[in-house]
Amino acid sequence: MDVRQRTEEIERLTLAPWATFSDASRGRVRPEEQDPIRPVFQRDRDRIIHCKAFRRLKQKTQVFLSPEGDLYRTRLTHTLEVAQIARTIARALRLNEDLTEAISLAHDLGHMPFGHAGESALDKLCPEGFRHYMQSLRVVDKLEKDGRGLNLTWEVRNGIVTHTKGTWAATPEGRIVRMADQIAFVNHDIEDAVRAGVLDPATLPRECTAVLGETKSQRITTMINSILRSSEGDVQVGAEENEAFLALKDFMYRTVYVDRSAKKEEQKVEKVLTELYEYYLTHIEQMSNFYLQLAYQEGRDRAVTDYISGMSDEFAIRTFEDVFVPRKWHVL
């Protein structure tokens, strides 16, 4: 018996009956030999951490576009906070932490530069529309490793495409990530909004803070405890906490996410991405051979969408300047 098999045996002895067991995975698109040390979901987690798309998250916007200061969240810090909350819940419920962490780390790999403003802009441009969760799946299936993809397990791939609105994940670990994503972004967006001066913490709805808590730590702890109390055979949150949380999220959408200063920047985002999109449609030779091949196989729109969606905020701005902003030149 090798290390992996011993780990799988420990899972069978210690995890809850409704957990997703590594040795019962539905497998990968392309079958592979088992690793002698790591179970399948741990291998997925490792592949995600080492992929290029994961590294790009450090320079992609969470909510505030190009904020001044080092303390604001990026898409990477958001991802790590989701993973922390999700793993805490998974461990307490005796579910599969490796699967939970893998889904958490991959759930936003397909996010555009400039956050949801970028997603909205590309959704208008792309004939097929654009949804970051579907792009996240495309990243791990098709775009990483020069077109070979990461060949992740079915369970992780399912968790990626179901972490937001729509169909619930097929595994309890995937459903944990969906809840952890919501808990993380609402609470850290409150903190960032206060730091940015667009939100006074005293204006948070009293009916929400009375249930969830006054601080970020209190609110996260309240939601985690509610899930732990309410989940037996399925992942759920208590009715009172859920109602307060939804009201708090609605408050954030009505106040912070529609802030006028943020909206002005979003107009600039749409212009930058529109100009880049239209430029590369007619100058596909400016993209790498990998994207040229994609254009040949799946069409120019698809290839340009993949190329732009993979850009970091800084790379998109720098590319826009290189293409459209005149440079000084010297005459001898």
Language-model segments: what does each one mean?
Residues 1-79, 83-89, 96-97, 118, ...:
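Histidine-centered, transition-metal-coordinating active-site segments
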Residues 99-125:
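Aspartate-rich (DDxxD/NDxxD/DxxxD) Mg2+/diphosphate-binding motifs
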